[in-house]
């Protein structure tokens, strides 16, 4: 027997099995092929640079002497302070979420107030005002979809139409905690209500916690492909936690701002938000605004049923003097269509804006544009330009990650067909 021939055959068979196993491994399970510095259209961080973009960095305070925010898991009490559900159901204290929020705020307690919500569909807006104490709202269903909060609101409707839609039967009245929020919007004299007043769920509460809920702007595909900002969830508070929540809509689905009680963006306030184990769906600028937001183990899905054109996941309006905007880690990006959607664009609300976002250690599917994953800026139309820097003789990338001459949209260690650098 020819031993060497048998050995060669065994080796060939083993090598073939290895190649077959590798080729059958799904792209999202293969190691990342992203290498720094990337390209001007798709800049990639080095391992050393990526160390600057972690939860701890994003949750640092504006005051350099203040400790960073270190959120722990949401802990729920055995007995909530309020229960929302059908009249007559056991333990129910309120039949509407807004009534429970009003009751929690009027307690004037510095202690966190817990509002449990029984499974069901709750049509209408929810406004959570600024207050000394924080609010936790959570669904009692087995899944997030068991509790649905929703309404169809379009930024393009006039204030009169909006007022009748949002405030049936005097839901918001003078003397009630959230009146100032409603009143600020109803007094608008513009032709349309605008994005700032288009949210179904709007909170200005510091320390807000949301868990096991579905929040949706149901405007959906009932409008054309034009500008129809329709916010499902808007948050203006600091130290906000969102866990196991479905946030559904189309344009500007999830809107984060640093606005105060006057409902205008501020230049001296930082809001921080942690989103975990959640699902966000939309088409144009589905996650937008000004604030430091970390998304961990979250699914982002871009749909094209309304626009039939390019969609954008992120639209950060980060101030140029702040280093951190949006961070997505251990997450999944899925888009309908073939290579049409884009990961994001800067929302240039003024000349002092340069949106910042990092997507790292995540999976991006084939629905995203590999040649141009980042789009030109909204409003200003500033062309996207990534900073590739220079490479020294030790193969270290040298560049200023906050250079105002470039965009601040980065990736690191992503996988999947859509993560390919071309």
Regions found by a protein language model. Give the residues of each.
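Bacterial N-terminal signal peptides that target proteins for export
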Residues: 2-10
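Intrinsically disordered, low-complexity serine/proline/glycine/threonine-rich regulatory regions
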Residues: 12-14
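C-terminal motif of bacterial Sec signal peptides marking the signal peptidase cleavage site
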Residues: 18-21
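Bacterial signal peptide processing site
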Residues: 23-25
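Sequence-level preference for short, compositionally simple segments enriched
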Residues: 30-422
